[in-house]
């Protein structure tokens, strides 16, 4: 914030600096999005947003008719958890709360069984906490495709964490008949959306919940799918602690997504 105040121009403004929770921030963002000019192109840097805030932002853009034409920018990570060895990677620890994301409540009917869908990332503990909280009748775990990953190193780490999570689930012996897996793109949100949609087409009559835990680009894809299919709920697991000293180092390229 100090950098912003030092370098800001007269028309620049800081939104949400006094907010103490996500609902207050969403209200402030809604006022800003509502005022976006239709004569100017909106460019949003999503790099440092939480998965929850990113999904809310997309919901607001859609609600106020500003989604089409908006450009999302994302600086991919060169390395995650750069203050640890590759075998000790951690991005967050613990889960404070699990909640549905504002704008994506879904349609949850008591008469239907629950289907939890997790595009898996590096945070196995968060995924385990979500599975334990929801106790779904059906569980789908997504793994990023090698050819649709940011880098081979990211794919290898992600694949290792995917196997850890699947091994945990297998050991519980709760989903022997109802566990399924799918692959998805980590670099193209439209592909991600279609990958998840194709997988979900195999199921019907369920309360579907998606918990995006991979990179922000795939979260965009999940949110876009849920805008098309509003019966799907999006959930977010809020960590107790982030690896603030070594979460990620910036890569040397920026992904631009034209919505």
Q: Which ranges hold each PLM region?
A:
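Long, low-complexity, Lys/Arg-enriched
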Residues: 1-42, 49-259
């Amino acid at each position: 914030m100090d950098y912003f105040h030092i370098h800001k121009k007269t028309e620049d403004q800081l939104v949400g600096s006094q907010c103490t929770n996500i609902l207050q921030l969403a209200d402030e963002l809604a006022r800003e999005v509502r005022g976006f000019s239709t004569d100017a192109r909106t460019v949003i840097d999503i790099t440092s947003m939480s998965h929850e805030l990113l999904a809310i932002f997309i919901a607001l853009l859609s609600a106020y008719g500003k989604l089409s034409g908006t450009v999302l920018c994302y600086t991919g990570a060169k390395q995650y958890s750069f203050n640890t060895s590759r075998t000790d990677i951690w991005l967050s620890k613990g889960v404070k709360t699990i909640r549905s994301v504002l704008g994506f409540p879904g349609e949850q009917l008591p008469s239907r069984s629950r289907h939890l869908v997790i595009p898996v990332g590096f945070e196995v503990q968060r995924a385990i906490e979500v599975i334990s909280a929801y106790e779904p009748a059906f569980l789908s775990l997504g793994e990023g495709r090698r050819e649709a990953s940011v880098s081979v190193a990211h794919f290898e780490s992600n694949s290792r964490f995917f196997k850890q999570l699947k091994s945990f689930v297998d050991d519980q012996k709760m989903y022997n008949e109802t566990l399924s897996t799918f692959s998805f793109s980590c670099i193209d949100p439209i592909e991600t959306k279609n990958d998840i949609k194709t997988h979900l087409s195999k199921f019907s009559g369920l309360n579907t919940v998606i918990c995006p835990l991979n990179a922000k680009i795939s979260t965009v894809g999940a949110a876009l799918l849920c805008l098309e299919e509003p019966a799907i709920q999006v959930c977010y697991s809020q960590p107790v602690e982030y690896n603030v000293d070594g979460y990620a180092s910036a890569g040397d390229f920026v992904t631009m997504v034209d919505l």
